[in-house]
């Protein structure tokens, strides 16, 4: 999301990069771009070629991967050219297109994290009822909503830029922050509101999970086999929710068979007669859930928060930053598109198997 404001000539007067510096920067950014492209392609191919992954929750992850792939293919390469050349030489029209695609895709990527968190929240707090509502059509509607909101957030500058052909100047491709209201509107809609929602949702998810773990740990004996099946379903449901891609469909009874067959962590059962043992397993699961949620939230916040703090500070004319700082913070945000496919699939066994299958197919071709 390349939204930079260089308000004074002094802010533009920076030391030119040496050839060595340009080469190092270029190689680093090319590696990031390549990895982002390959990892997101792998997620898309894994979901597309693995029938077991054809679930509504994974459609959201696939859409996130498509969005991050667009960032890698359409946004990052032009940013590399711009940074290495120290000036924009690709014309006014391409500048307009690039800025619009940049803002739309980055905003859409962030909003995808929001709907994934919302999907998980509903899945863990209202598992049975939401399993019936969790369909491909609902996932498609959520994806369409995300793209619509992203367009409404990122497109307004096109309307006033069309009347200002001399700004930005031909050598620069930046969005000028002379509309304070839009700066506040765009930063709130693209980051601060989604961040607040994500924090609230994952906080509630963690406490709901902790409560379920404690309830599981406190039950000494299961009354009958039917009750055991229901509790096992809840345990599997919970585990898969925190393993990032849960497998709920519209039919909870058939999904129980899949959960029961694929669960890796055994539920609390009659063998755990000692309260200390039950408490230890419950605490282990709580720590694992907290660790995964911490990684997801930490990666998102560390990637994008510095950029959007800079946007508000610069947009409100509190402080100006150099182009190097602006570029660094922009690429720190882009790196989130590299991290997303790792975080949202690495904790799931079915994704791991799908990736191994793709690698084996690649070796045989």
Curated annotation (Swiss-Prot):
GO terms for molecular function: G protein-coupled receptor activity; G protein-coupled serotonin receptor activity; Gi/o-coupled serotonin receptor activity; neurotransmitter receptor activity; serotonin binding; serotonin receptor activity. It comes from the Eukaryota. Its main location: membrane. It is a multi-pass membrane protein. GO terms for biological process: adenylate cyclase-inhibiting G protein-coupled receptor signaling pathway; adenylate cyclase-inhibiting serotonin receptor signaling pathway; chemical synaptic transmission; G protein-coupled receptor signaling pathway; G protein-coupled receptor signaling pathway, coupled to cyclic nucleotide second messenger. A motif (NPxxY motif) lies at residues 340-344. GO terms for cellular component: dendrite; plasma membrane; synapse. Residues 46-59, 119-138, 204-291, 346-365 are cytoplasmic. It comes from Homo sapiens. Glycans are attached at residues 2, 5. This is 5-hydroxytryptamine receptor 1E. Detected in brain. Residues 1-21, 85-92, 158-179, 317-322 are extracellular. It is found in: Cell membrane. G-protein coupled receptor for 5-hydroxytryptamine (serotonin). Also functions as a receptor for various alkaloids and psychoactive substances. Ligand binding causes a conformation change that triggers signaling via guanine nucleotide-binding proteins (G proteins) and modulates the activity of downstream effectors, such as adenylate cyclase. HTR1E is coupled to G(i)/G(o) G alpha proteins and mediates inhibitory neurotransmission by inhibiting adenylate cyclase activity. Disulfide bonds join 95-173. The chain crosses the membrane at residues 22-45, 60-84, 93-118, 139-157, 180-203, 292-316, 323-345. Keywords: Cell membrane, Disulfide bond, G-protein coupled receptor, Glycoprotein, Membrane, Receptor, Transducer, Transmembrane, Transmembrane helix. Belongs to the G-protein coupled receptor 1 family. Serotonin binds at residues 102, 106. Changing residue 311 to A: Increased G(i)/(o)-coupled receptor activity. InterPro entries: 5HT_rcpt, GPCR_Rhodpsn, GPCR_Rhodpsn_7TM. Coiled coil: none annotated. A motif (DRY motif) lies at residues 119-121.
């Amino acid at each position: 999301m390349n939204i930079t404001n260089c308000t004074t000539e002094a802010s533009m007067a920076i030391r030119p990069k040496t050839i060595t510096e340009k080469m190092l920067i270029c190689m680093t950014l090319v590696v990031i771009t390549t990895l982002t492209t390959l990892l997101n392609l792998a997620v898309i191919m894994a979901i597309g070629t693995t029938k077991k992954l054809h679930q509504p929750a994974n459609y959201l992850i696939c859409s996130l991967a498509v969005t991050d792939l667009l960032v890698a293919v359409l946004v990052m390469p032009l940013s590399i050219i711009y940074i290495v050349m120290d000036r924009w030489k690709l014309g006014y029209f391409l500048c307009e297109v690039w800025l619009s695609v940049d803002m739309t895709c980055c905003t859409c990527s962030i909003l995808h994290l929001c709907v994934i968190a919302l999907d998980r929240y509903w899945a863990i707090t209202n598992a049975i009822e939401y399993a019936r509502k969790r369909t491909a059509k609902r996932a498609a509607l959520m994806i369409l909503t995300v793209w619509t909101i992203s367009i409404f957030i990122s497109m307004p500058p096109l309307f006033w830029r069309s009347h200002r052909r001399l700004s930005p100047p031909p050598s620069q491709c930046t969005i000028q922050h002379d509309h304070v209201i839009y700066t506040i509107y765009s930063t709130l809609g693209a980051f601060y509101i989604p961040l607040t929602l994500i924090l609230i949702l994952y906080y509630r998810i963690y406490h709901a999970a902790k409560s379920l773990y404690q309830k599981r740990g406190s039950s000494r004996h299961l009354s009958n086999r039917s009750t055991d099946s229901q509790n096992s379903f809840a345990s599997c449901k919970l585990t898969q929710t925190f393993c990032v891609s849960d497998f709920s469909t519209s039919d909870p009874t058939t999904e129980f068979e899949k959960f029961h067959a694929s669960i890796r962590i055994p539920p609390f059962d009659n063998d755990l007669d000692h309260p200390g043992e039950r408490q230890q397993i419950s605490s282990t699961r709580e720590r694992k859930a907290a660790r995964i949620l911490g990684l997801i939230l930490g990666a998102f916040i560390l990637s994008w928060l510095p950029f959007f703090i800079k946007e508000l500070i610069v947009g409100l004319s509190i402080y100006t930053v150099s182009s190097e700082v602006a570029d660094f913070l922009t690429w720190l945000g882009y790196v989130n598109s590299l991290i997303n496919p790792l975080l949202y699939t690495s904790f799931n066994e079915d994704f791991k198997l799908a990736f191994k299958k793709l690698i084996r197919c690649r070796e045989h071709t």
